[in-house]
């Protein structure tokens, strides 16, 4: 009988995929901590404007942010309203967990799709601006997708891509810190690729801060960069882009 004491596995002994995930979570927590330092207050979307506003923002917050549009979302909405003083701008915060369980992003995809299609049907003259931060950027990109990857089973509540006619009601798509392919694979190896549909490409702005490890193709090297979109000028840039399209 082997009586030698067993050592607890260290990070260096874990399989490569698990080490990557461990590193990814450390980066994510560091990024979120940086975002909290930028603005520690909890933001909530403003009260709904008129039943059919001139502009409808649909925003999905990032991982761990409390319900609402989050820090980046509020900065974007504030900038957009400042750019459109003569238009009514309503805001809808996508309802989903925004948790470490990336598979639950599908809840956000279903909720955002339902909202977008509802606005298109009930308020055909309203211009929509779709936007999201981090995991929320993935959610909003997913709702624009053209097709379902082969052998991918659609989650409950999602029947397939939105009708192409919906794209005509969407003025702009602005994304902040959308997970790169490499980062997505660390989050969930079963997640479908994050792609922007062809109908939305010309009206999309996909922003990634320098050295942001979540969205940079090479991984980046500054976790704090992922939490700085509210103050690095990119929310104003995105608002200006959306303003030109509504």
Regions found by a protein language model. Give the residues of each.
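The alpha/beta-hydrolase serine catalytic core
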Residues: 164-244
């Amino acid at each position: 009988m082997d009586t030698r004491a067993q050592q607890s596995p260290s990070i260096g002994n874990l399989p490569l995929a698990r080490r990557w995930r461990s590193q990814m979570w450390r980066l994510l927590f560091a990024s979120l901590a940086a975002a909290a330092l930028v603005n520690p207050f909890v933001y909530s979307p403003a009260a709904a404007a008129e039943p059919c506003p001139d502009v409808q923002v649909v925003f999905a917050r990032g991982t761990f942010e409390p319900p609402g549009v989050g820090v980046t979302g509020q900065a974007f909405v504030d900038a957009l309203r400042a750019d459109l003083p003569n238009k009514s701008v309503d805001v809808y915060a996508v309802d989903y967990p925004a948790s470490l369980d990336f598979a639950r992003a599908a809840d956000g995809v279903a909720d955002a799709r339902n909202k977008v299609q509802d606005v298109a049907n009930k308020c055909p003259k309203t211009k929509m601006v779709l936007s999201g931060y981090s995991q929320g950027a993935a959610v909003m990109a997913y709702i624009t997708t053209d097709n379902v990857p082969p052998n991918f089973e659609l989650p409950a509540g999602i029947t397939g891509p939105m009708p192409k006619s919906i794209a005509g009601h969407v003025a702009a798509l602005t994304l902040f810190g959308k997970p790169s392919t490499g980062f997505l694979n660390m989050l969930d190896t079963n997640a479908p690729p994050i792609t922007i549909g062809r109908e939305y490409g010309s009206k999309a702005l996909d922003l990634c801060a320098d050295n942001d490890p979540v969205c940079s193709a090479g991984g980046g090297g500054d976790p704090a960069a992922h939490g700085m979109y509210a103050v690095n000028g990119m929310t104003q840039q995105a608002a200006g882009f959306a303003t030109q399209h509504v």
